[in-house]
Curated annotation (Swiss-Prot):
GO terms for biological process: coenzyme A biosynthetic process. NCBIfam families: dephospho-CoA kinase. GO terms for molecular function: ATP binding; dephospho-CoA kinase activity. One of its GO terms (cellular component) is cytoplasm. The gene is coaE. Disulfide bonds: none annotated. This is Dephospho-CoA kinase. It comes from Shewanella oneidensis (strain ATCC 700550 / JCM 31522 / CIP 106686 / LMG 19005 / NCIMB 14063 / MR-1). The keyword Transport does not apply.
Length: 205
């Protein structure tokens, strides 16, 4: 991969989107795994057609789009079906993300991936950046934002890579316990560092 890529990750409610948007304000292109995951199953795509032929048309909404909630429910307790779905979608998502990286026009690219380490996508990046907050804050922020109960959020946290493992595997860490002004300063400092690293990377490419 010719572009210098930073993999941005963090647990649910950690503030990944806020941090990603601050990098975008610095003029950096974002490749977001969640956005790509929706694009590969948009109406008319091979991804959606494969899901319909496997699970049936009941997986569609009235407007012909994928009913994500219904699909999630369908595969949640069925390991075999979940594996089938992952084997279909993960390579598509990965390929589309790499295409978007190559098309990016900024000096480096931020790849926003919630499950960067869990899905082995850290192998696609040159540097990893973890947005870190305490589990207590993760729960309170997500409950407020998504209007879900704390038990649900806790289950999601427990299904993801542990906080200590994420921090141990991170090249860079942003502590998101403070004010937005502090966050902006941290992002700006990292941006300068990544410009330097991408310059060295591009010079030796």
């Amino acid at each position: 991969m010719s572009k210098f890529v930073v993999g941005l990750t963090g647990g649910i409610g950690s503030g990944k989107t806020t941090v990603a948007n601050l990098f975008a304000e610095e003029g950096i292109c974002l490749v977001d795994a969640d956005v790509v995951a929706r694009e590969v199953v948009a109406p008319g795509t091979h991804g959606l057609n494969a899901i319909i032929s496997h699970f049936g048309t009941e997986m569609l909404t009235a407007s012909g789009e994928l009913d994500r909630a219904k699909l999630r429910q369908r595969v949640f307790n069925d390991e075999q079906e979940r594996q089938w779905l992952n084997q279909l979608l993960h390579p598509m998502i990965r390929q589309e993300m790499l295409l978007q990286v190559e098309k990016a026009t900024s000096d480096y690219v931020i790849m926003v991936v919630p499950l960067l380490f869990e899905n082995g996508l850290d192998r696609l990046v040159h540097r990893t950046l973890v947005v870190d907050i305490s589990p207590e804050l993760q729960i309170s922020r997500t409950v407020q934002r998504d209007n879900v109960d704390a038990t649900q959020v806790n289950n999601i946290i427990n299904s993801q890579c542990s906080r200590s493992e994420k921090l141990a595997r991170a090249d860079d860490i942003i502590d998101n316990h403070g004010e937005i002004s502090r966050l902006k300063r941290e992002v700006h400092a990292l941006h300068q560092r990544y410009l330097q690293l991408s310059g060295n990377h591009n010079a030796h490419d």
